Regions:
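Short, glycine-rich nucleotide/cofactor-binding loops
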Residues: 70-79
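Nucleotide-activated chemistry modules centered on ATP-dependent adenylation/adenylyltransferase
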Residues: 1-69, 86-339
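Hydrophobic positions on the alpha1 helix immediately C-terminal to the Walker A/P-loop
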Residues: 82-83
Length: 339
């Protein structure tokens, strides 16, 4: 039987989730810590600011044969926009954006427009397009074998930018949020250190443990997360940027992105299983995958959204329950047939 966090709606079926002795998930524990007395909060954020400034200075001094201070993996989604502008305009760093692109027929029109808009804001972007034949075979295989057609592609989304950082001698890479703080999936430190991301539910084990028969090494190179030994030898730091931004929330990131020209979905939640239409707009297959997640684990993307809404005070737990019952796991047949 599924159990839920006592203060939000985080389910016990979420991979790698933990609850404390009071029945609270890591997200609620973290959010509670942000609401402590003013002096403590002020001290904590001053400490985080000193830490990210120190990381910035370290990166600028340790880049080798590169004009770039850091890499930011991007999809041109709401979080990508927030990270790119924060790193360039607030931290005053020179980032190289790395996008692991979908095959053309999979990329949505909105997704392409959002990427075009981001590039035009003055960023250098490397776009990696993996072999679409292998990509599609992996989608089909992962759906049948793992019930998650995006399992392999998510490996590439996380691994490919690390390969670029190592190849270009760029010492620092930023991911967005620590999953333990946003959805309660703990697979590493509860800090800004992102080296533990390789233990995440979807990407752990790597492509060679999928059960898929690759014909040559180049077929899986960008799906394979570099070893800790290789990362350490090249002195690469991997950081959760969201840990250092006080108002890092998906909804606020979306508002920021929209002000920069980001476009969101216009379809209704009953068709998409997405309350606000600003998540994963570059790919419609994600909607089907969230539906499958709902069938497997008993929760979908709406649950993730209301957890954040509860913490921001947009919804009460009781209101969130009604919304989840109405929209979670929704997916129009048009998206299923498109897949």
């Amino acid at each position: 039987m599924i159990k839920f966090c006592k203060t939000c709606l985080n389910p016990s079926t979420r991979p790698n989730i933990k609850f404390d002795k009071n029945g609270k998930c890591y997200v609620c524990v973290y959010e509670s810590s942000k609401k402590l007395d003013f002096k403590y909060k002020k001290y904590e954020w001053e400490k985080k600011n000193r830490e990210i400034q120190s990381i910035k200075e370290w990166a600028k001094k340790n880049k080798t044969n590169s004009n770039y201070d850091c890499i930011i993996p991007v999809s041109a989604g709401k979080d990508s926009y927030r990270q790119a502008f924060y790193v360039r305009d607030v931290l005053k760093m020179n980032p190289l954006l790395v996008c692991n692109s979908y095959p053309p027929e999979q990329l949505t029109t909105i997704g392409a427009a959002n990427m075009d808009n981001l590039i035009k804001k003055g960023f250098d972007v490397i776009i990696i397009s993996l072999d679409p034949v292998v990509w599609k075979k992996l989608y089909r295989f992962c759906l049948k074998k793992h019930g998650n057609m995006m399992k392999a592609s998510e490996m590439a989304l996380y691994a490919a930018p690390v390969h670029i950082a190592l190849s270009y001698g760029i010492p620092l890479m930023f991911y967005g949020e620590n999953p333990a703080h946003t959805i309660g999936e703990k697979h590493g430190e509860l800090t800004g250190d992102a080296i533990g991301i390789r233990k995440g539910n979807t990407i752990k084990g790597g492509p060679l443990n999928l059960g898929f028969k690759f014909t040559k090494k180049s077929d899986y190179f960008f799906y394979n997360y570099p070893s800790l030994k290789n990362i350490s030898r090249n002195n690469l730091k991997i950081i959760y940027l969201g840990y250092y931004i006080k108002d890092w929330y998906g909804y606020k990131n979306a508002k920021f992105a929209i002000n920069k020209g980001f476009k969101k979905r216009t379809d209704k939640p009953i068709n998409t299983g997405d309350l606000w239409g600003f998540t994963g707009v570059d790919d419609d297959i994600r909607l089907v995958n969230q539906y499958l997640k709902y069938l497997k684990y008993g929760f979908g993307h709406v649950t993730d959204q209301v957890i954040e809404a509860i913490h921001q005070g947009f919804l009460t737990r009781e209101e969130a329950i009604k919304i989840v019952k109405k929209y979670d796991g929704a997916c129009s047949q048009k998206y299923i047939l498109k897949f």
